[in-house]
UniProtKB/Swiss-Prot annotation:
Transmembrane segments: 397-417
Residue ranges, Extracellular side: 22-396
Annotated protein name in UniProt: Nectin 1b
Observed effect of gene inactivation: Fishes lacking both nectin1a and nectin1b leads to defects in cell adhesion upon serum depletion. The absence of nectin1a and nectin1b also promotes melanoma spreading in melanoma models.
Organism: Danio rerio
Compartments (UniProt record): Cell membrane; Cell junction, Adherens junction
Entry keywords, A to Z: Cell adhesion, Cell junction, Cell membrane, Disulfide bond, Glycoprotein, Membrane, Repeat, Signal, Transmembrane, Transmembrane helix
Gene that this polypeptide is encoded by: nectin1b
Subunit: Cis- and trans-homodimer. Can form trans-heterodimers.
Glycosylation sites: 51, 105, 180, 242, 326, 337, 372
GO molecular function: cell adhesion mediator activity
Tissue expression: Expressed in the developing eye and nervous system.
Amino acid sequence: MDKQESFFVGHKSHRCSQNRSVSQIHQRTSRLSECYTVPLQWPHGIVWHNNNSLLKGLEAGNGQSVQTDPSKSGFVGDTVELKCLFINGKPPVKISQVTWQKLINGTKQNVAIANPALGVSVLTPFKDRVSFKHPAVRQRTPSSLEDTTIVFSSLRLSDEAAYICEYTTFPAGNRENMVNLTVFARPVTKMTLTSPTIVARTPKRKMPVATCMSANGKPPSVIKWDTTLKGEATFQETRNPNGTVTVRSNYIVLPSRETHRQKLTCIVTYRSERFTDSVILNVQYEPEVKIEGFDGNWYLNRPNVQLTCNADANPPVTVYQWKLLNGSLPNNIEIKNNTLFFKGPVTYELGGTYVCEATNSIGTRSGLVEVNVTELPNIPFDEREIPAELHSSGAAIGGAVGGVALLVAAIALLVFFLRRRQRTFKGDYSTKKHVFGNGYSKAGGMPAHPPMPKNLQYPDDSDDEKKPAQISGPGGFESGDRDFDGNSEDLKRPYFTVDEGESRDYDERTLAFQYDPEPEIADDMVSQTDGSVISKKEWYV
């Protein structure tokens, strides 16, 4: 190194001797973008235009560079390293000085300086917390300045900034690079009950019951609630002077007996970390009273009956008081704590409305029960005992009834089918028969009117004179070629065949019976394909 070095600021030259202190040199090099350390004799081929042009020309010509991390981060109180490496080129250049600077709002503040001849200097604000990592640099006269990484310890929020590592070289000039340092503040999280005593009063009002707070965090935390309790949450952020943020959230509910002993969980998320805290609500409320012991079956002479006053309260009930509406309590009772014992058998005098009042420090509530006394026990039907023999006899009777019902149904069906089959044709089995409408005739032909008996037999219960009646006159029918005997077998038949159209005339003029309008075939008749029927005897022949 030459005895004299020249610091150029703009187009002006400043000379400083080599024996000057580091602090004096540091003051000269505070504006790194404008001041360069170069020899008085310029290298051949370099033309000075301005400081930036010189820097670019040296970079292009020699290829020196400074390597740093793009960014670094740490929490308050932690230790972090800011790397700075100098990559020399060919031919190599000579490192005259290394300077670390802090850039805040466009202003540069020197942090540490390493000079091969003058040693290492750390400025006062960082003196106890910043040091060079490489042992060769920490020597009184640094032997190597190619690795000038610094170590930040006990980080503070004020350390957050951009830091510049600048190398002053000969004859290449200055090389620099920058690293951004971010400082995080881990918040302090806690959850508390809003009030040590939460009271459910009348009228009911909403109130905050728990508070979750994440204080002095950077960046701010996110708070959520996890609970089955119905309510709503409020959130508030406060920015502190040091750059941290305090987040506060209250959970608001309507205090009641149902909210007592409910669990509230606060979930705080800070970056990738998660914190949880829980509280159990302690809600004080008036007693909830219910009287038990009356089962609706207090009958005369029933022994050992009692009434119990059960109260759900927080804090617990301290006083129980019994009374009977519209009267005084019977003489045969004994009160122990919350129970009313009735001595002796039940009588009608025990009936009435019993009231129990329960009192705690929050208030007094009451419950009542209406006691009715009956003469006989009220035994539910499903609880009555049925003898075993009744069970067996009932099963037998049920089986018998079921069997009889099935038998009757079978007989009815059999009778029905038999009666239908008994409706047969009452003629003889002589010749082939044809069906005409609803009546029958022989194959020889159909007369104008079927032969009718001259006398009809009246039923025995008829009111008219029971004697044969002559059918004659203009309204009568011709007897044809055949004479009928009043005592013949044909007249004793209950029906005879007529044409359907003529049957109406018979109904109007005679006492003849009406018949089924549908043709019926006897069991000894066989139906033919042409619509006729013949007797089985003729069919087999």
